[in-house]
C-alpha cells in the first residue's frame, strides 16, 4: 500500500529569476528559483567566452602555476 502525503508540493508555474528579472517559468518543487546563469546568458549559447568565478579560484590557479590571465587556451597549448 502506498504512503499518502509523502510527495513535495508541486508548483507548475514556478518563476526563474536571473539578475532580478523573470527569465522563464518551469515546474518545480519551489515557487521561485534564483539562478546566476541560464541559457540566455550562458557563454556556450551566446558564443562569448566568459569565466564565471565567484570565489577567486581561477586567479589563485593562475598565480600558483605562473600563468597570466591574458593568455588564451590556444597560446598555452602551443609547444
From Swiss-Prot:
Function: Binds the 23S rRNA.
Species: Trichormus variabilis (strain ATCC 29413 / PCC 7937)
Any single Gene Ontology cellular-component annotation: ribonucleoprotein complex
GO terms classed as biological process: translation
Record key words, sorted: Ribonucleoprotein, Ribosomal protein, RNA-binding, rRNA-binding
Protein's recorded name: Large ribosomal subunit protein bL31
HAMAP family: Ribosomal_bL31_1
Name of the gene: rpmE
Pfam entry (one): Ribosomal_L31
Subunit structure: Part of the 50S ribosomal subunit.
GO MF entry, a single one: structural constituent of ribosome
Recorded family membership: Belongs to the bacterial ribosomal protein bL31 family. Type A subfamily.
